[in-house]
Amino acid sequence: MKFRTILCLRTETHYFYGMNVLLLGSGGREHAMAWKLSESSMLRDLHIAPGNGGMHELGTMADLDAMDFQAVERYVRRHKIDLIVVGSEAPLVAGISDYFEASQKTSVTVVGPKKQGAMLEGSKEFAKNFMQRHNIPTARYASFGSDQLAEAVQSLDAFQAPYVIKADGLAGGKGVMST
């Protein structure tokens, strides 16, 4: 495991920290994270990618695709980023934490689970199977592919209404239908 020392200077009663942070995301959750990060006395510079129109006052906006890990890595090296905070799920599910842990070019710390842990959010089926395997209480379910519509409809007899249908994978909070 690689660690990086964060600069901390002490003068009489004050500490001055120098941490450069890259926040990945563009939604409301990331906006709230940027707001709180920008208030930290430990922050030197906050970089936000891709951000949204309301976040430009909180930090430096970066025209960066969070799914292009090599581009993120180049940005991290160029701007001497100490910490990456991943707000959106897609880069986590794609393995950004694993990528930077394996990187020989940078020793940046990533806040966010590794790819396998992110699958709990990234795949409803993975999460349900995990819960069953570890005896974690969860609602009954059945999983079907898009080519199994007849089987899915037929299985409704085994469940009691109301039914909740969820898309497997990331859906930006819009992958649920309830009847």
Task: Set out the residue ranges of the language-model regions.
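Short, glycine-/small-residue-rich phosphate/pyrophosphate-handling segment
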Residues: 123-144, 152
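Short, positively charged and aromatic/hydrophobic N-terminal segments
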Residues: 5-6, 15
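Short acidic-hydrophobic, aromatic-tinged amphipathic segments that line or gate anion-handling sites
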Residues: 61-67, 142-147, 179
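Glycine-rich phosphate-binding loop of ATP-grasp-fold ATP-dependent ligases
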Residues: 139-143, 163-179
